Regions:
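Conserved beta-strand positions that form and line the central face of beta-propeller blades
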Residues: 33, 74, 85, 109
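Solvent-exposed coil/turn segments that connect beta secondary-structure elements
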Residues: 37-39, 78-80, 129-133
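Short histidine-centered loop motifs in beta-beta connectors
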Residues: 80-104
């Protein structure tokens, strides 16, 4: 059985970068970056660009916006303002606010980040948050999440069933380039 692999910079509230660009983030990480896993034989693997992105729980699309590596899909799970954000993806062209999704339904593919100056590997960024009830979806974007003061962020790892997660010290670029 394989396992997810996380480096400290991939985790919620980390101030560190985990990609070759290195250094510190300007703000604490708002979620979890997912891209590395073991193949069950002990080999380390990473997502290929274009891998399908399924949703973790049923919900309704309330917003789709650009982010710095692709696009982000905001999914409301209940009418209490609990939202998951799937970022750095290429969403299906049919996704629009109001679109209802079932658990496991594919919403898009991980964006190809090759050629970016920061050399960041293709990955899925997952944010879990609560927003004020009744907030219009068109107000949701990364500027709102990071600067409005109206968002409560949650650690995605505490909300996921993840018995096969492994935390590794250091950064990915340290393991690839000793």
């Amino acid at each position: 059985m394989g396992a997810w692999i996380f480096y400290p910079g991939m985790l919620f509230r980390s101030r560190d970068k985990w990609w070759p660009d290195a250094g510190s983030r300007p703000t604490a990480h708002e979620g979890l970056d997912i891209c590395y896993f073991t193949d069950g034989l002990g080999g380390k693997r990473q997502f290929d660009p274009g891998i399908n992105v399924p949703v973790m729980a049923a919900g309704t699309v309330i917003a789709v916006c650009d982010d710095f590596l692709g696009r982000s899909v905001f999914l409301e799970h209940l009418s209490d303002g609990m939202i998951s954000v799937y970022a750095h993806i290429i969403p299906l062209k049919t996704l629009r606010p109001g679109y209802k999704l079932s658990e496991g339904q594919v919403i898009g593919k991980v964006a190809d980040t090759a050629g970016r100056k920061n050399r960041m590997p293709a990955h899925l960024h997952l944010t879990i948050m609560r927003i004020p009830v009744g907030l219009p979806g068109e107000q949701l974007n990364w500027n709102f999440i990071c600067r409005s003061g109206r968002v409560t962020l949650f650690d995605p790892l505490t909300m996921m069933v993840c018995p096969s997660c492994r935390m590794l010290p250091g950064t990915d670029h340290e393991s690839q380039h000793p």
